[in-house]
């Protein structure tokens, strides 16, 4: 987005609070925001042009108590959207498949396991899309600097979000090819005595830890903590 539009702000749960940047924005600004379930609980008028829910897996149940409650809060990101807006959803997630018919926005699917009639998907190592006018091969995942199927899913979601907003595909794909892992998310640290170290301290639930382990291509030792 920053390559497409200079007046772009990356805010929210990812680091910089939305409230810290909001007074710098105007009607032509773009904000890319990661919104937590805690923040969605109290959001009343939040209306994204393009929203995305990448998955719904057990997390923060000490606050939300049940998966039904947690799913409802996550899905509420779309509550103020209309058919003029878009929502990017993971086709492999059973919660999101059940939610899709109720979603007020236009749904855009992505899948790492299934070739979709409409949406973004993997065929072997190729990221493809079909929006109703035939299959288009976008790129090979081997050209990326990220590893792991879950990262390929994240990239498909990011491509879908940016394309729905109107960013040229050439700009999107060039950005993807040069994008490096963000801090604490399967972030390469160092190689010492033949051992490769990755920092995945953002993986704060069992599913995230499982995805990180699956991304490893060699014998792996996990150093972790927590309650699960």
Segments (PLM) and residue ranges:
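Short active-site oxyanion
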Residues: 6-8, 28-29, 82-87, 194-197, ...
